[in-house]
């Protein structure tokens, strides 16, 4: 995963 995907996954984990 790259930085962009990492940020997307982080937001998804936050329930956004």
UniProtKB/Swiss-Prot annotation:
It comes from the Eukaryota. The keyword Iron-sulfur does not apply. Conversion of fibrinogen to fibrin is triggered by thrombin, which cleaves fibrinopeptides A and B from alpha and beta chains, and thus exposes the N-terminal polymerization sites responsible for the formation of the soft clot. The soft clot is converted into the hard clot by factor XIIIA which catalyzes the epsilon-(gamma-glutamyl)lysine cross-linking between gamma chains (stronger) and between alpha chains (weaker) of different monomers. GO terms for cellular component: extracellular region. Keywords: Adaptive immunity, Blood coagulation, Coiled coil, Disulfide bond, Hemostasis, Immunity, Innate immunity, Secreted. GO terms for biological process: adaptive immune response; blood coagulation; innate immune response. It is found in: Secreted. Signal peptide: none annotated. The keyword Disulfide bond applies. A long coiled coil structure formed by 3 polypeptide chains connects the central nodule to the C-terminal domains (distal nodules). The long C-terminal ends of the alpha chains fold back, contributing a fourth strand to the coiled coil structure. Cleaved by the protease thrombin to yield monomers which, together with fibrinogen beta (FGB) and fibrinogen gamma (FGG), polymerize to form an insoluble fibrin matrix. Fibrin has a major function in hemostasis as one of the primary components of blood clots. In addition, functions during the early stages of wound repair to stabilize the lesion and guide cell migration during re-epithelialization. Was originally thought to be essential for platelet aggregation, based on in vitro studies using anticoagulated blood. Heterohexamer; disulfide linked. Contains 2 sets of 3 non-identical chains (alpha, beta and gamma). The 2 heterotrimers are in head to head conformation with the N-termini in a small central domain. This is Fibrinogen alpha chain. The gene is FGA.
